Curated annotation (Swiss-Prot):
Expressed by the venom gland (anterior main gland) (at protein level). The lineage of its organism: Eukaryota, Metazoa, Ecdysozoa, Arthropoda, Hexapoda. This is Kazal peptide Pr13a. Disulfide bonds join C23-C59, C27-C52, C36-C73. May act as a serine protease inhibitor, since it possess the kazal serine protease inhibitor signature. It comes from the Eukaryota.
């Protein structure tokens, strides 16, 4: 039983690492240019430092935020 749990944990970690590697999250070269975004499914709003960080967040959290205007929410 312990080996099954360990196996499942390792599979989860591997999937998480694979997902992270597909996402483009090197946003250091992008200037601070805040955007207000809305999540299409939930309607939640969030301020992101720039569009790169918004895209990174969407990819790593499986969300669908879209920019609704420039500036903080």
């Amino acid at each position: 039983m312990k080996y099954i749990i360990l196996f499942l944990v390792l599979i989860g970690l591997q999937a998480n690492l694979a997902l992270g590697s597909k996402c483009k999250c090197d946003c250091t070269k992008y200037p601070y240019s805040p955007v207000c975004a809305k999540e299409l499914k939930t309607g939640d709003t969030e301020t992101f430092n720039n569009v790169c960080q918004l895209q990174c967040y969407n990819c790593t959290h499986m969300k669908n935020y879209v920019v609704i205007y420039s500036g903080s929410c």
